[in-house]
Regions:
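Extended, helix-rich architectural segments
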Residues: 1-211, 216-225
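Extended, charged amphipathic alpha-helical segments
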Residues: 211, 219-259
Length: 259
């Protein structure tokens, strides 16, 4: 789809979120009993009161322990921390006489790749990601970092995210509702454009939280992805980027076709 106006992006988010709400009661039960430490349902995500006791309805730890074992076993079996869990190898199109030379080059790339991933705290983010996957859906945002953290792996709670599917049931568009203190917006998003009216609104208390809607959606005409951040009202566009690749990793443990 072409680039959306802020109010149209708000409508797309509302529509996708309404569709997600059909599974809300299932998510509430799953997080309440199996993953209470990451539960943002039951009003925890909207109450703006962090640090609440989320264990009031938990009288048996079987589900919690089973969820943690599932995530730990999956991580140790597929993505073992502090280990090189995959190897880049020459493809079939590489001549046999060049296999040794190419493999040596690819091993150097693999070594560098894992060094960057460890420096970027991939193992920690993957642990959170697999806990979310135990509930059914896991979401990770992968963004460029800086010299200290070259890649930013951010596991996003499913409470904050809603999707639209493209062809073949693949997640194609992702919308997220998030909050940030006003005074960190320009640090986190260097290309943000804040209107004077918005600056005036938060001039008395720059630590006040700002409600934002983020959209990442596919443009089939260009093959790129539009990335936008707007204010919750859908009036102002704060950030726009034209992305060559999809920054989201979406994993669903079990997906029923056509649902």
């Amino acid at each position: 789809m072409p680039k959306l106006k802020p109010n149209d992006l708000k409508k797309r988010y509302d529509s996708a979120n309404s569709h997600k709400d059909q599974w809300r009661s299932i998510y509430e039960d799953a997080y309440r009993y199996a993953l209470p430490m990451r539960n943002l349902y039951d009003g925890y995500g909207t109450a703006n009161v962090p640090g609440q006791n989320k264990m009031n309805d938990v009288f048996d730890s079987t589900a919690i322990q089973s969820t943690q074992k599932f995530a730990n076993r999956l991580q140790s079996g597929v993505f073992p921390p502090q280990r090189d869990w995959c190897r880049l190898m020459p493809g079939d199109e590489i001549p046999d006489e060049r296999n040794v030379e190419v493999q040596r080059i690819l091993d150097d790339y693999s070594k560098k790749m894992f060094a960057v991933m460890r420096q970027s705290q991939f193992d920690m983010s993957m642990g959170e990601f697999l806990l979310e996957l135990a509930v059914g859906t896991a979401v990770m945002l992968v963004q460029p970092g800086d010299e200290v953290q070259p890649i930013r792996y951010t596991c996003i709670p499913t409470f904050s995210v809603c999707f639209e599917e493209g062809p073949f049931g693949k997640v194609q568009n992702v919308y997220r509702k998030m909050k940030r203190p006003f005074n960190v917006l320009e640090q986190e998003f260097p290309d943000i454009k804040i209107s004077q009216a918005m600056r005036s609104r938060y001039s008395n208390d720059e630590t006040e939280m700002v409600d934002l809607i983020e959209g990442t959606y596919y443009d089939k005409l260009t093959g790129n992805y539009h990335y936008q951040i707007i204010d919750e009202s859908g009036q102002d566009e704060l950030v726009y980027r034209d992305l060559k690749s999809f920054p989201w990793i979406i994993a669903r443990f079990l997906k029923l076709s056509s649902e």
